[in-house]
Amino acid sequence: MSFKATITESGKQNIWFRAIYVLSTIQDDIKITVTTNELIAWSMNETDTTLCQVRFQKSFFEEYEFKPHEIVFGENGVQVIEDTYGNSHKLYSFRVNGRHLTTISRKPDGDGIKSFTIAVNNTSTCPESLANRLIVVIEMDSLIVKEYCPQFQPIKYDPIIINLKYKRRFLDVFGTAASDRNPQEPLDPKLLDVFTNTERELTSALFNEEVESDIRKRNQLTAADEINYICCNSTLLKNFLDNCNVNVTDEVKLEINVHRLSITAFTKAVYGKNNDLLRNALSMSNTISTLDLEHYCLFTTIEDEKQDKRSHSKRREHMKSIIFKLKDFKNFITIGPSWKTTQDGNDNISLWFCHPGDPILMQMQKPGVKLELVEVTDSNINDDILEGKFIKTAISGSKEEAGLKDNKESCESPLKSKTALKRENLPHSVAGTRNSPLKVSYLTPDNGSTVAKTYRNNTARKLFVEEQSQSTNYEQDKRFRQASSVHMNMNREQSFDIGTTHEVACPRNESNSLKRSIADICNETEDPTQQSTFAKRADTTVTWGKALPAADDEVSCSNIDRKGMLKKEKLKHMQGLLNSQNDTSNHKKQDNKEMEDGLGLTQVEKPRGIFD
């Protein structure tokens, strides 16, 4: 055999089947390139706007062998290349029908696949019927062996190294920014691992002779060096794309700054010749915080570097935007979840993009598999990269420090009053109540010449108001009337208490069972230091809560109201006892009088008439 590769694990079989299907949706023909270390399956559409490439490492297959020196038939597909170290490598490329290969690779429903093998036998001993044919052998769990031999056409491999160029620029721009970063703001160790793995990949790549390193300092960067990088969990994007119908929405827009990532699926309106609406415009979007992303590196510009340092909060954050097609992107995202059991649990997707109109590179990596998608973007976006004069790079920091900083900022409530925060320093002051954020603020002159911004007082608002309540002095008049009414009530109770003391003096021997006398209770009510606030039924009001006085020597209103009501109930009880005693004494006097008079005639005597 010139080439042979076997897959026995079910998870690897699923990702192989899914990758072949996605490649067939881009182009009917799939190109396969075989090297000593990997198998590359790729396809490009007819308009050259989408390129999908899947690299299967040698370790992905349980059995992998490649003997290019034995190839006799189809020698047009053999190539010899040299790497950066001067070592020669042979590879073999051919093109096969993707529809046929997808149908062959489809997993049956009622039976499992024990092993899946693809092979090429273009040696001198192969029969003519198997020359330039891809041999596909499938062994089922039911001991059934299926063998297919679709024909292929040998081709030359013309590598498209957009991925290597983007990654080299990524290291040149942000690798130097990471080295010049402030030691007090360290980078995420995972991001440093990304830099290391990218450098290792560029070093071991076979087609990197055209990729040149141009490492420069931050102050030497230009607008042409722009490169942006985003890394997040593929589930964040997949959950959104599952709700998008490719027949309704055909484009995707990504917008990102240092605070949030917004992904929008939309379709533009289509009008006919007579300005008739043929298709409505539709869009749906989702916003993700940058704290939920793994890493991000943004390339922006600023107008003034000194002003940026002085007023960081006031400057406008630059938003990076990119637009590309939805269909291929959605199919590409669905390859990752087909492999359910991952060894390292890496479900991240990485994106590199430059200016609008330049291709966008997407990459997902599994153990032994690397999936890449390149799409041409829309150039009809107003990019503000040339507005500024100074280049600025934004790199995501450590997740732990970002989480602590976010927690500190979130602990402080935006509605908390400053007076309440300083209450500990002012023991005898009243804590400031929280003002409603919906109340309209107005300007009132202070004691000095300056004008201070204040809020309206927390006055009670009734559902049913009187005309007098709309006046400005209504609150003061109301407080005066309440104070006068309380004073009158206190005078009435005091006069009542004085009158009752004389009545209680007579039957004092009958009320010995009571613990406290009425006179004592009256004396307590006459004590001005223990005047109580009388509880009354409040009106129906809509108002904000008001804090109680924070002084320690004052008694709470609830305790005062409770004591006052208790004293009132005792007075009522004593008055009831006195009334009942008076009633019983009156009944006894009447009974004694009747006993003294005796019982008389029950009928009044009348003279009898003539007819009686």
UniProtKB/Swiss-Prot annotation:
Q: Does the keyword Transmembrane helix apply?
A: no
Q: Where in the cell is it found?
A: Cytoplasm; Nucleus
Q: Name one GO biological process term.
A: cellular response to ionizing radiation
A GO molecular-function term, please? Answer: protein kinase activator activity
Give the principal location in a single coarse category.
cytoplasm
Q: At which residues is Phosphoserine found?
A: 436
Database matches in InterPro entries: Ddc1, DNA_clamp_sf, Rad9/Ddc1
Q: Where is this region: Disordered?
A: 576-612
Q: Where is the composition biased (Basic and acidic residues)?
A: 585-596
Task: Give the UniProt family note.
Answer: Belongs to the DDC1 family.
Briefly, what is this protein's role?
Component of the checkpoint clamp complex involved in the surveillance mechanism that allows the DNA repair pathways to act to restore the integrity of the DNA prior to DNA synthesis or separation of the replicated chromosomes. Associates with sites of DNA damage and modulates the MEC1 signaling pathway and the activation of RAD53 in response to DNA damage at phase G1. The complex also physically regulates DNA polymerase zeta-dependent mutagenesis by controlling the access of polymerase zeta to damaged DNA.
- Further remarks about this protein from its record: Present with 238 molecules/cell in log phase SD medium.
The protein's name? DNA damage checkpoint protein 1
